[in-house]
Amino acid sequence: MPREHMQSAKVVLILCSCFFAYGTYWSDWSFDYYFLWANLADHPNAVSRATQYYTNQLDAPDIIKYIPFVNLIIAAVGLSAGLANMTDGNILFDGASLVLMLFALSTYATSVKPAIKNISDAELVNELTTNLKNIAAAHFIITLAITGIVGLQITHYVLNKRADNAERAEAVAAAAAKKSK
């Protein structure tokens, strides 16, 4: 029973972290959409609005910039709790989730962060558009990585529940067989 609670708590921590990240990228979607899926010529204000939005993010107070680190710590605690169990399933599912998390972090660090910094220095519309397209593409890639983490964690949780239910059924059957003797 304690193993079940640990598994549930781990999944809750990781999923809460993932859904917080989804919310963050969802708020960016209203600006990113035009650079991925629409014709910019049909939306002449898209570049200026996105530029203003990401410039404001760069100028945000430091406390707001540190909030995502709390989210990462929550996810790290959840993944650490899973990896601490050292079962094959935990190593496979939580290890793959960790790889996806590191991939998302590296995508953010190498694509999003530099592009946001470049926006404030860019003077040509082509430079701005290129940086905004890089941000939008990186956000999409990060969202796919987060979706992979959610899928892995839910699958692992369901498989563990099935295994636990099968163990209980076997124990009940063994107890019933023992009683009937």
What residues fall within each predicted segment?
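Helix-loop boundary elements of multi-pass alpha-helical membrane proteins
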Residues: M1-L15, A76-V99
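Juxtamembrane membrane-interface segments at transmembrane-helix boundaries in membrane proteins
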Residues: M1-R3, A46-I64, E123-H139
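Extended, helix-rich structural scaffolds rather than catalytic motifs
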Residues: E4-F35, L72, L100-A104
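Membrane-helix exit/juxtamembrane interface segments
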Residues: A21-A46, I91-G95, L105-A115
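Interhelical loop segments of eukaryotic multi-pass membrane proteins
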Residues: S30-T51, L98, K117-V125, D164-E170
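Transmembrane alpha-helix entry/boundary detector in multi-pass membrane proteins
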Residues: A41-I73, G89-S97
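Eukaryotic polytopic
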Residues: L83-N160
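Non-transmembrane, juxtamembrane loop and terminal tail segments
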Residues: N165-K181
